[in-house]
């Protein structure tokens, strides 16, 4: 069957491997959503291979995969850590207390040996506020560090900036090599 929508589906599974969550994202536009009946406790994640358990947390699956790509570009094994998408963060309303997202609470329940949480939420006010609230609320359970992207609004923006810089460097090298002939 030929699909006309060009979307990607990020599937989250419970500890038994049963699909319980699915986020949909357009490859050619801004469309994003969740499949009806999705349970946010089981948002998209990638488990580390072995070693001490640490998790890197992102607002979206795209940011988690961008982080994996950045690690690979740096020569590191992205599978040496776990990656968890929250499937977005709830908007804070005036006077409302920000809570720990269900996906992270479930992940910590399923991984009681987790010894570190790295929060790579968006570098905007809602992302920074959520990161502070989450770090504060999980502190009694596990250390959490707030690590927004060094450039751009989110990890995917940072990846694009890194790739653009690498391309500029390659172009400059090609020009320099041509001039040296």
Per-region residue spans from a language model:
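Short pre-functional
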Residues: 9-10, 55-58
């Amino acid at each position: 069957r030929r699909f006309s929508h060009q979307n990607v589906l990020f599937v989250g599974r419970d500890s038994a491997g049963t699909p319980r969550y699915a986020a949909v994202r357009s490859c050619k536009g801004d469309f994003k959503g969740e499949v009806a009946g999705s349970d946010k406790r089981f948002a998209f994640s990638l488990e580390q291979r072995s070693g001490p358990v640490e998790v890197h947390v992102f607002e979206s699956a795209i940011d988690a995969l961008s982080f994996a790509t950045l690690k690979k570009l740096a020569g590191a094994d992205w599978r040496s850590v776990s990656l968890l998408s929250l499937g977005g963060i709830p908007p804070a309303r005036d006077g409302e207390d920000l809570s720990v997202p269900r996906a992270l609470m479930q992940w910590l329940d399923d991984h009681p040996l987790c010894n570190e949480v790295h929060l790579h939420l968006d570098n905007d006010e809602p992302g920074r506020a959520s990161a502070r609230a989450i770090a504060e609320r999980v502190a009694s359970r596990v250390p959490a560090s707030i690590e927004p992207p060094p450039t751009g609004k989110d990890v995917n923006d940072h990846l694009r900036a890194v790739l653009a810089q690498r391309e500029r460097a390659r172009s400059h090298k090609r020009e320099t090599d041509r001039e040296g002939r």
